[in-house]
């Protein structure tokens, strides 16, 4: 191809950023390994798994979220009580799906001094590529466990 050198350069830059991200994930996972977290949605599950975290989202709430249905009042209360009890060390909140239920959950997290990592399903406009966005998300997770 006529732009072979350009493509090779871009590929090399991409792989360098990818290696940096993998190193950052490995470094951060030393702090987050086995850390119990809960999530208003499973949007960050793969990243949390890469960070070796433990999903402690109460089962009823998690099932309702996975089925794209509303959690029952008992599920919401269980989530709030679990946040207050202390085993959850981080709440992951999908701000694109904010509603009165997630307001109750994030409110309980704030009351219990549980750090909240806010993220979205779509890459925010301030990022020009996936690797920069993912790197910023890893930074947010790392900052939440300091």
Regions found by a protein language model. Give the residues of each.
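Extracytoplasmic metal-acquisition and chelation regions
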Residues: 1-146
């Amino acid at each position: 191809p006529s732009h072979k050198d350009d493509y090779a350069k871009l590929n090399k830059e991409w792989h360098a950023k990818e290696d940096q991200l993998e190193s950052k994930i490995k470094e951060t996972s030393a702090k987050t390994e086995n850390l119990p977290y809960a999530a208003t949605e499973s949007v960050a599950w793969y990243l949390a798994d890469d960070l070796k975290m433990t999903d402690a989202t109460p089962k009823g709430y998690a099932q309702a979220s996975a089925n794209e249905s509303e959690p029952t009042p008992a599920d919401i209360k269980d989530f709030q009580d679990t946040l207050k009890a202390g085993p959850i060390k981080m709440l992951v909140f999908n701000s694109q799906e904010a509603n009165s239920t997630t307001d109750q959950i994030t409110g309980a997290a704030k009351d219990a001094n549980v750090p909240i990592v806010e993220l979205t399903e779509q890459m925010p406009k301030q990022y020009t590529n996936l690797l920069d966005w993912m790197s910023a998300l890893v930074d947010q997770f790392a900052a939440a466990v300091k």
